[in-house]
């Protein structure tokens, strides 16, 4: 799942990182349950307590546990499910899900720079390539 410039490593083997190591987006461990990739993330960086990835803000602490499930439901669809558990700030686990659909054509890297002054030429080149 892409969100701006965030990059998260999901390790498929190993143990959780020591508590002294706090990656900005947490420590993600994944495993397969049949055809579903399950990712459990803990150990969020203390300054990463406010998320706005789904148009709503929610708080996270160093005790937060996020479980994500990625299941291919058809050739072009992926069911994304998540749950957030943190007894220090929430009275119960809360959940959400959405269907992610593949797009036609290439997916370009999300990269920008101050002013984005080159975007006009980048888009012009892409439109020319489409015409050819």
Model-derived regions: residue spans:
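Hydrophobic small-molecule pocket/channel-lining residues, especially in calycin-type beta-barrels
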Residues: 1-132
């Amino acid at each position: 799942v892409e969100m701006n410039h965030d990059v998260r490593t999901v390790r498929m083997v190993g143990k959780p990182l020591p508590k002294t190591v706090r990656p900005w987006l947490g420590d993600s461990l994944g495993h397969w349950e049949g055809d579903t990739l399950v990712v459990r993330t803990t150990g969020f960086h203390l300054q990463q307590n406010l998320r706005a990835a789904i148009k709503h803000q929610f708080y996270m602490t160093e005790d937060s546990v996020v479980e994500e499930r990625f299941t291919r439901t058809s050739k072009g669809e992926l069911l994304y499910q998540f749950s957030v558990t943190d007894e220090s700030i929430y009275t119960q686990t809360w959940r959400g899900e959405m269907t992610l659909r593949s797009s036609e054509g290439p997916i370009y890297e999300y990269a920008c720079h101050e002013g984005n002054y080159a975007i006009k030429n980048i888009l012009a080149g892409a439109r020319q390539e489409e015409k050819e």
